[in-house]
Amino acid sequence: MAPIQYIVEGGHRLSGSIEPSGNKNSALPIIAAALLTEHPVTLENVPRIRDTETLVELIRSVGAAAEWTARNTLHIHAKSIRAADLDPELCVRIRASILLAGPLLARCGEVMLPPPGGDVIGRRRLDTHVLALEQLGAKVTATDRLEFRAPKLAGADVFLDEPSVTATENALVAAVAADGVTYLRNAASEPHVQDLANFLVALGAKIEGIGTNTMIIHGPATLGEATYRIQPDHIEVGSLIGLAAVTRSPLRIVRAGVEHLRSIRMGFERLGIVCRVEGDDLIVPSNQTLKIQDDFGGHVPKLEDQPWPAFPADLMSIAIVTATQCEGVILMFEKMFESRMFFVDKLIAMGARIVLCDPHRAIIAGPSRLRGAPMTSPDIRAGMAMLLAAVCAEGTSTINNADQIERGYERIEERLNALGAKIKRVPERKS
């Protein structure tokens, strides 16, 4: 497929209502976990994006039947699957290919995985996956690929050396099939981890402590069929809050999943953006003074990411762009990935006042008038942040490699245009 370019005419106010897509980071582990059961599974509210399409190709390659029965409904039947060398070209497209380790190990006793791909946002180690699965009885060999073998998985007291989301998900899925009780400690507790756990419960698994950092899994579970609806994407909701703020636009985000938005709302409140909750809808008013809230004692305020339930790393790029349109100075501290802030040079070229202190910290002084500019998206979240900057800038911007944005945001240009944005999606022009 030819690379995609967005041509964005900035300076237009938006208005209306928008519903967030299903959570990509829920959909990927849940699609993989559907391989655990021999019975049919129907998944609703699945975002139809490149990453989910690629994972569907991967599960088909090991023998699962998978069919899109509606725009966002996926039917999976893994009645008979086989251990197979996964296609390296598919695996390199998405980091989520590593999520197949747990379910294939459980069903087939072995799996061979080429190195996973995904965003280039810094060092993303696989050690936690390996250590967790080894504690459940797997033997892991690393050559030009990762080979996992486990004729039988056994419950264990597993302590993760870091609260990695995908390692938690792999260990959780494997533990459901393991013989005996597994204690999964220092586990990630993000909404998408909770979504996966609730899906496994819908299949018949017995899991205690969902939403906490210690889960207890009683295995092996007898799994059946299920129809399951994937929850709204809280990261997309945060992106839409930022979009409404930088364009000074009134926006209603419907069926937003507000129970998972408290830390996100608090983060934006530091930038002077207050949202109103009505039922499960989130309203971003347009008549707000975007002023960064000072810390007590006059210190420069700071917004930092941390593991859930704190402000999520996937929204730091959005928060940086939003801060360029707010009055005041703030320090942004990205703790998790050492390459995620490198896109700020594009914002500086557009007129933003940003000092990149080191790979993890940036100081933003606002407000700044942004001017349209050519950009290239390095990853999903920075690409979406660039799109926010382009929509609020004066003049026209181009965003090359917009395919990266579409890996995480479904039909985003179409949905934003319905609110009043002016975004053209065209094949990328070769220079």
UniProtKB/Swiss-Prot annotation:
Enzyme Commission code: 2.5.1.7
UniProt subcellular location: Cytoplasm
Residue stretches spanning the membrane: none
Primary localization: cytoplasm
Residue ranges the record marks as coiled coil: none
Domain of life: Bacteria
Residues annotated for phosphoenolpyruvate binding in this entry: 24-25
GO molecular function, one term: UDP-N-acetylglucosamine 1-carboxyvinyltransferase activity
Listed HAMAP family: MurA (MF_00111)
Cited function: Cell wall formation. Adds enolpyruvyl to UDP-N-acetylglucosamine.
Family, as annotated: Belongs to the EPSP synthase family. MurA subfamily.
Name used for this protein in its record: UDP-N-acetylglucosamine 1-carboxyvinyltransferase
